[in-house]
A protein has these predicted regions:
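Active-site substrate-recognition segment that forms the wall
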Residues: 1-109
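C-terminal catalytic lobe of FAD-dependent flavoproteins
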Residues: 82-142
């Protein structure tokens, strides 16, 4: 969220993301995107992340029971084998969001600055492509 101040970008607003952690392997990831919700299972080495929310301009950092209920019901539609007894916790974070990702070069005091922010809830999805573009922009001569 620091881009609001660092880059003087008033367009940056939080997209509140809430997730649940479960010690159960779904085998593969599951994804479904609808307005205001991002339903997914992302297997990691230690847990599977169940998500999630994308509540734009919501600064709330508390885990909300109603969001957990929504996440679980949507995940169970994609992954009926989910075992709720294996839930071990959850988290909330604020993802910088804007109308479109800011991925560009700006020169500040004759120094090249590459901006790459505003992905909102699509950070995981866009990370590889954006990282490649950042590398290209950095390697281009001034």
């Amino acid at each position: 969220m620091g881009a609001r101040e660092l880059c003087d970008d008033d367009e940056v607003v939080p997209a509140r993301g809430q997730v649940i952690f479960v010690e159960q392997d779904p085998g593969v990831g599951h994804f479904d995107q609808q307005p205001e919700t991002l339903t997914y299972t992302i297997p990691r080495s230690d847990v599977t992340v169940l998500g999630g929310t994308a509540q734009v301009d919501d600064w709330g950092m508390d885990i909300r029971a109603e969001d957990n209920d929504l996440i679980l019901s949507k995940v169970e539609a994609l992954w009926p084998e989910l075992d709720r007894s294996r839930i071990i916790g959850g988290a909330v974070g604020l993802r910088p969001s804007r109308s479109e990702v800011r991925l560009e070069v700006e020169y500040i005091d004759e120094r090249k600055v590459v901006h790459n922010y505003g992905h909102g809830g699509a950070g995981v999805t866009l990370s590889w492509g954006c990282a490649e573009e950042v590398a290209n922009l950095v390697s281009q001569s001034a």
